[in-house]
């Protein structure tokens, strides 16, 4: 009986670090809607991670656009348009070349990100063993992004 308890205890101890790491990964893409402007754009609070501060900022912008396009906003104030722009089940794979180019470093996704709502000193920065994290407030130009996806025949309506 003692050996079973010892084995169970060692197993629990061995699995604890992986559970902590899995939780950290989930929080890496936390995106909250702060509000919707009269022009239909969405103000989001988003986190990005990278090997340096510039990479973390760019990743935060990519995360925000990706979430608006594919995942939809899960958290935030009422009144935010929570639905993703692309609702087709296999769109990521079907239009893989298009989205690889669109989300490339310095790609067209930046045309639909505005830093107008970013206030000086409002960004949260942190450095850890992996790299930098950067939390910032940005605006996604959702109507223009939707028009682009329609023009490129990615979405209908």
Predicted regions and their residues:
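Domain-level marker for long, solvent-exposed, non-transmembrane regions
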Residues: 20-157
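Bacterial Sec-dependent N-terminal signal peptides
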Residues: 1-25
């Amino acid at each position: 009986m003692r050996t079973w308890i010892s084995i169970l205890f060692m197993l629990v101890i061995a699995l604890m670090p992986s559970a902590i790491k899995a939780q950290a990964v989930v929080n890496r893409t936390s995106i909250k809607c702060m509000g919707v402007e009269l022009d239909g754009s969405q103000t989001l609070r988003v986190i990005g991670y990278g090997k340096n501060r510039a990479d973390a900022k760019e990743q935060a912008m990519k995360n925000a656009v990706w979430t608006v396009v594919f995942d939809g906003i899960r958290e935030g104030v009422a009144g935010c348009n929570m639905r993703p722009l692309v609702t087709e089940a296999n769109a990521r794979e079907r239009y893989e070349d298009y989205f690889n180019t669109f989300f490339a470093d310095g790609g067209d996704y930046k045309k639909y990100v505005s830093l107008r709502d970013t206030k000086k000193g409002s960004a949260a920065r942190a450095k850890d063993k992996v790299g930098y994290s950067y939390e910032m407030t940005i605006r996604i130009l959702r109507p223009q992004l939707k028009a682009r996806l329609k023009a490129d025949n990615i979405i209908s309506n």
